[in-house]
Design a protein with these regions (language model features):
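Subtilisin-like peptidase catalytic core
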Residues: 173-187, 300-388, 394
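P-loop NTPase catalytic cores that bind/hydrolyze ATP
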Residues: 307-313, 387, 394, 398, ...
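Extracellular S/T/G-rich loop segment that most often corresponds to the catalytic His/Ser-adjacent loop
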Residues: 267, 273-277, 281, 428-524
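Catalytic cores of nucleotide-enabled group-transfer and carboxylate-activating enzymes in metabolic
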Residues: 216, 223-232, 261, 305-308, ...
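Autoinhibitory propeptides
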Residues: 1-59, 64, 82-176, 184-260
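Active-site neighborhood of phospho(di)ester-bond hydrolases with catalytic His/Asp-centered motifs
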Residues: 375-377, 407-412, 446-447
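Catalytic-core regions built around general acid/base machinery
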Residues: 391-404, 433-436
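Subtilisin-like serine protease catalytic core
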Residues: 258-289, 294-352, 404, 439-443, ...
Length: 532
């Protein structure tokens, strides 16, 4: 390993930023005019009361002893501060959702909300009260438009009225809340959707942290009322996940495993894909073939390509020789079979969020004690919204925390190389931003750089591949996390054959393909080696 050079795993000094650790003093007086500032806070609380009065006839929480509202901190203050969080709790405000460093949704009982109004009034009138109110800039009623993904807002601005397939993320109520409150709120939300000509598209589901999701087809003109419901946290177009096509050629030489490698000692990677169909000579590398409960198996095409990139380093060079030296074993998690809930008869390859999440979670629960590395080479076909982390990106983060696993995720592919004439033009286009779930913050999103230059290609050697999506990620987070060498793509959509585009296909054939689907597994294999 000492001489093993992997340039895509190196972090240069230029990429490391030293950050000074500044200790924050909470006893400092901000020097605010108490009357002016207190009046602003009191007004905000009164507007929240007025807003609840306006929606009391239709809101999903109308009969519950709970108030959901937004707390905005002063510039420079952060919800990561423990003392500030404790102050909020003491004042009857329980954090429900931290939106960013300064904005959070909190919950309170109606009686504690009334008490909060009184205490803010005492602060305003300079009576004995908690001075920490100075760190709060405002109290606000959650804005319905602010809960909508940017693409939905754009459609509404154009006054579009057609039905849109959306996923509505509910606000997960704080721990200690009676679970029946959440259940009743969801029932009322579904009733509200149906009253507004909406159609439920699949059974409501929950993320691994308990966050409820309702998927429905709703006329755009009706989304404003639904978004304004206090139990609604975020509304975004339903996510669907696809893989890349490829072409195959007959294998030029037989494929044989290096007999000097002890297969049983190799590390293991779980491949979450369409299934694996290695030739008989390579089958010993597959620990198990598995299909989720009740699922139809995938066609094994894309999954075989991906698994070959996990199992073998510098695969193109090895295939030319015919003697393959493996570096990892594979758990074949065949999760990409037909999705009965996608409701996309014209695109049977697409899998919706609820189905994908259920299948991934089942795989993690089954294999988490055997491997900690899971490769996921599927993505949405459109860029992330960026205002909120994607549902699947969020779920992968939760699974990483709960079970100590790590996902290697393809950054996603675009087709801008078909319409743009230069790589520079591609990189300037907003449509090349990463696709979900590569916005996951705790896992590894992998992009592609070109390994070999071709005169027909738009990218030179070591340039960003002309199809590879780039950052930033959620709220400007740096993405992708890492890149690997890959094949390129011509303007006509042809993959020039070279060692970086070469991989194993189902049926004992070779394949030539380019895409971030095939760089993520390279990093998964690398990670398995260095983690052993």
């Amino acid at each position: 390993m000492a001489d093993d050079f992997r340039p895509h795993l190196l972090i240069t000094e230029d990429d490391v930023e030293a950050i000074e650790n500044k200790k924050q003093a909470r006893s400092k007086d901000l020097g605010l005019d108490r009357m002016k500032h207190g009046t602003k806070l009191s007004t905000g609380l009164q507007e929240i009361v007025s807003a609840y009065t306006r929606v009391q006839g239709t809101d999903s929480l109308r009969d519950e002893d709970i108030r959901l509202f937004e707390v905005v901190l002063q510039e420079g203050e952060k919800f990561s501060n423990k003392t500030l969080r404790e102050f909020l709790e003491q004042e009857g405000m329980t954090l429900a959702k931290v939106k960013d460093s300064r904005h959070a949704i909190v919950s309170s009982s109606k009686s504690k909300f009334d008490s909060l109004q009184q205490r803010v009034g005492a602060y305003r009138d300079n009576k004995r009260s908690n001075k920490k109110f100075q760190y709060i800039d405002d109290f606000q009623f959650p804005d319905g438009m602010g809960k909508q993904a940017p693409s939905i807002k754009e459609l509404l601005e154009r006054e579009a009225t057609f039905p849109l397939d959306v996923e509505i993320m509910e606000q997960l109520l704080p721990k200690g809340t009676d679970p029946q409150v959440q259940a009743r709120a969801e029932e009322r939300l579904i009733a509200l959707i149906e009253q507004n000509q909406g159609k439920i598209q699949a059974k409501p589901y929950k993320l691994s942290d308990g966050t409820p999701i309702v998927r429905a087809e709703i006329p755009l003109g009706k989304l404003e009322e639904i978004s304004g419901d206090t139990i609604v946290s975020h509304v975004a177009p339903t996510g669907f996940y696809a893989t890349s096509p490829m072409y195959t050629v007959q294998a030029g030489t037989p494929m044989t495993l290096n007999p000097n490698v002890s297969i049983d000692e190799l590390p293991i990677v779980a491949v979450l894909d369409t299934g694996v169909d290695f030739p008989l000579e390579l089958e010993p590398l597959v620990v198990e073939h598995w299909v989720p409960t009740g699922a139809t198996p995938g066609d094994k095409k894309h999954g075989t390509n991906v698994a070959s990139k996990v199992a073998f380093e510098n695969l193109g060079e090895q295939l030319a020789s015919g003697i393959l030296t493996p570096r990892a074993r594979i758990i074949d998690c065949n999760i990409r079979g037909l999705d009965p809930d996608s409701n996309k008869p014209d695109r049977p390859d697409l899998i919706c969020n609820s189905t994908m999440i259920a299948r991934i979670k089942e795989a993690v629960l089954r294999y988490k004690d055997i491997t900690k590395i899971f490769n996921f080479s599927s993505s949405e076909e459109t860029p992330i919204q960026g205002d909120e982390i994607s549902i699947l990106g969020y779920e992968l983060d939760v699974l990483a925390i709960q079970y100590g696993v790590k996902f290697t995720i393809s950054a996603g592919n675009h087709y801008l190389y078909r319409s743009q004439d230069t790589l520079e033009d591609i990189l300037k286009d907003d449509d090349n931003r990463i696709a979900a779930p590569a916005d996951s913050m705790l896992n590894i999103a992998v992009g592609a750089i070109v390994g070999a230059e071709h005169k027909e290609g738009l990218s030179r050697q070591y340039d960003v591949a002309p199809y590879s999506r780039i950052g930033p990620g959620f709220r400007g987070f740096r993405k992708p996390d890492i890149v690997s060498l890959a094949g390129t793509m011509t303007k006509a959509g042809v993959v020039p054959p070279d060692e970086y585009a070469m991989m194993i296909a189902s049926g004992g054939q070779w394949a030539f393909q380019a895409g971030t689907s095939f760089t993520a597994p390279i990093v998964a294999g690398d990670l398995a080696e260095i983690s052993q």
